[in-house]
Amino acid sequence: MKRTFQPNRARRKKKIGFRARMDTSGGRRILSARRRKGRKTISA
C-alpha cells in the first residue's frame, strides 16, 4: 500500500506556503492564530 505522505516541494509551497496563506482571508487568520500562539514557524 502506498503511504499517504508523498513529499513534493512545489505542491507544499503552493498549498501551504506563506504567499498562499496571505492570499485568502482564512489563510491570514491561520497566520495570525499561529503568531498569537507563538509558533516558531508560521508557514511552510
From Swiss-Prot:
The keyword Ribonucleoprotein applies. InterPro entries: Ribosomal_bL34, Ribosomal_bL34_CS. Residues 31-44 have a biased composition (Basic residues). GO terms for molecular function: structural constituent of ribosome. The keyword Transport does not apply. One of its GO terms (biological process) is translation. Residues 21-44 are annotated as: Disordered. Keywords: Ribonucleoprotein, Ribosomal protein. GO terms for cellular component: ribonucleoprotein complex; ribosome. Belongs to the bacterial ribosomal protein bL34 family. PANTHER family: LARGE RIBOSOMAL SUBUNIT PROTEIN BL34M, MITOCHONDRIAL RIBOSOMAL PROTEIN 34 FAMILY MEMBER. This is Large ribosomal subunit protein bL34. It comes from Endomicrobium trichonymphae. The gene is rpmH.
